[in-house]
Amino acid sequence: VCTVGGEGSHHALATALHARAVGLEAHLLLTPQPHTAHSRATHAAALAAATSVTALAASDPRSFAVGLAAWRERRRGYLIPTGGSCALGAVGMAEGALELRAQVDAGLLPPPRALYIAAGSGSSLAGLLLGLAAAWPDPRARPEVIAARVTPRHLVSRGRVLRIHEELKALLWGEEAPPPHVAAPPPFELLSATGPGYGAPSAAGEEARGWAEGVGFKLDPSYMGKMMGLLWARERERAREEGRAVVAWGTGAE
């Protein structure tokens, strides 16, 4: 198998470890990133576990194409998309949205008016959108979705998210028409929160991480910290004034 990610990618490390456990070779194409102690340790573990590691010049689609072509010339195998991003992987996020609705119905939390999520490669967001549409058939009752893009634009875009959403519908319903309320994805915002770049802590994210740690939550700087920074900037005063419930959807941790 071959997959792609940043040097500190949990997905790349997990691919290498699990491939080795079942007797498969694991070939990683890794892009450079600024490092924290955690990402540096993750990178070292991936180097030790993988069959081969190709260092890409930068997080650039041209560099990726060259690295992938070189791998295909040498070997035959299965390519796992960047971050494992695919329709099958999005199923769990759709189910997560149904769990959220069940918790609301059980009175465990108030109906959320907004939901924030970090977007790295798009499949988590696509699955969440489909799940929210299924869980809240009335679009007026659905939480608005704000995605914080934490990777370069070519890795996650509205078009990519919508494409995975279509693939997920095809996976779940096949040739049958899905229910009308899930036929089209709910509206969503995809806003940049990359800051200095992928893996590099942002000022807003670090401020939000400090606040979160004070109330008992440890957020990673690459995904959750930047997402929380966006939430903090947009919702801090609004939530106080309107008393509205907001969900921060967790997708990464150290």
What are these regions (language model features)?
Residues 1-254:
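PLP-dependent amino-acid enzyme catalytic core
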